[in-house]
């Protein structure tokens, strides 16, 4: 049994205090790094056996007593003991400061999981007999025909089953910040701002098997393409939140107003491989793929996938802002608190163009109440 450790460490260095504007400025830098391991479930490691069948003969005359169907039943053991735990490494560095009741912090982080779980396909060659029922003399039958002496040909079929692999990668990185002021006496209000820029990438670290959905001479396509680059996406966004917290103690009122801004959000699909690096035949043999040869081959050219450049362009959604309001009232010596909130009471969501299409956006506000008791 192999042990898996999840070490983590954090360190903060407080720098010497300095005077700024006649007041103390306390500041420091910090960092941390750690690993997190996620173990596969039992059904990933030991899934149930997979059974399949292939029709070898289907003799189906009008006379019911003469009918016979012969199947080859095969069993696949999908035991997956080679699957490893998914490992995630995260580190961060940052700085913080406090001055005159105001605080500020900024943090950069990166999180990389290179062995995440995903489903993949494995192809197996199954050899079955294809009996020639045209050789059966129905007039000589007293019952279902015998397979002995019946001519047949061996036919190889590629069959697939899914299993879990360590073929997924997730990379997250971003910048977070927060800032808050002391309560401004003139209006008894504290200002708090925070936000983050986040970029997430999803990638497949293992080759993809692809079989064109076409028929060749009335039979399923005989080859499986093996592609290196496939199904990846990345997303990024920048969001901020500005909150004004105003208290009126004499009336027992608290006003909270937040301005939530999404400055942009975007996504892009990673380009897929147009040409496979190799391909698999029905016998399970891997052959190198020559694009020049495949262009003129009526069968191999189906492995060349269509590539549309517009599908992989970066798509960005522009600025949008929502304003939320919450009013709280304390009653009966602070034993009862009643709050009314209205989210998206005001919004800024301008229309924008995406290519030749105009995208119109709308926001639906909603409201509610909260009632808290203290006994």
Residue ranges and their predicted role:
Residues 260-308, 315-322, 326-375:
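C-terminal beta-signal and adjacent terminal beta-strands/loops
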Residues 1, 60, 72-79, 156-164, ...:
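Extracytoplasmic loops and strand-loop junctions of Gram-negative outer membrane beta-barrel proteins
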Residues 1-103, 107-111:
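Structural signature of Gram-negative outer-membrane beta-barrels, strongest in the C-terminal barrel
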Residues 1, 29-35, 44-46, 97, ...:
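Transmembrane beta-barrel strands of outer-membrane/channel proteins
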Residues 9-15, 93-99, 108, 175-181, ...:
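Residues on the lipid-exposed face of transmembrane beta-strands in outer-membrane beta-barrel proteins
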């Amino acid at each position: 049994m192999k042990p898996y450790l999840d070490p983590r460490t954090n360190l903060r260095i407080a720098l010497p205090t300095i005077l700024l504007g006649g007041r103390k400025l306390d500041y420091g830098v910090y960092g941390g790094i750690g690993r997190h391991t996620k173990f596969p479930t039992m059904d990933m490691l030991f899934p149930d056996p997979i059974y399949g069948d292939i029709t070898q003969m289907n003799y189906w005359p009008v006379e019911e007593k003469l009918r016979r169907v012969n199947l080859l039943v095969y069993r696949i053991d999908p035991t997956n003991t080679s699957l490893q735990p998914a490992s995630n490494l995260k580190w961060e560095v940052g700085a913080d400061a406090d001055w005159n009741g105001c605080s500020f912090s900024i943090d950069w982080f990166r999180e990389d999981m290179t062995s995440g779980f995903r489903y993949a396909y494995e192809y197996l060659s199954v050899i079955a007999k294809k009996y020639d029922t045209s050789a059966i003399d129905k007039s000589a039958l007293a019952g279902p025909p015998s397979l002995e002496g019946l001519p047949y040909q061996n036919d190889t079929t590629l069959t697939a089953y899914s299993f879990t692999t360590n073929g997924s990668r997730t990379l997250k990185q971003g910048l977070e910040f927060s800032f808050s002021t002391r309560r401004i006496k003139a209006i008894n209000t504290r200002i708090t701002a925070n936000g983050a820029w986040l970029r997430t990438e999803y990638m497949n670290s293992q080759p993809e098997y692809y079989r064109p959905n076409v028929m060749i001479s009335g039979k399923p396509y005989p080859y499986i393409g093996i592609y290196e680059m496939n199904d990846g996406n990345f997303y990024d966004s920048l969001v901020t939140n500005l909150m004004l917290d105003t208290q009126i103690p004499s009336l027992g009122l608290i006003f909270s107003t937040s301005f939530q801004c999404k400055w942009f959000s975007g996504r892009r699909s990673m380009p897929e491989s147009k040409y496979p690096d190799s391909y698999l035949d029905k016998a399970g043999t891997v052959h190198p793929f020559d694009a020049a040869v495949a262009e003129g081959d009526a069968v191999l050219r189906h492995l060349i996938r269509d590539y549309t450049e517009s599908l992989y362009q970066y798509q960005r959604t522009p600025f949008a802002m929502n304003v939320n309001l919450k009013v709280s009232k304390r009653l009966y010596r602070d034993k009862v608190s009643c709050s009314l909130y209205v989210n998206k009471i005001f919004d800024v969501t301008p229309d924008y163009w995406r290519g030749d299409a105009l995208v119109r956006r709308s926001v639906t506000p909603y409201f509610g109440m909260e009632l808290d008791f203290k006994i």
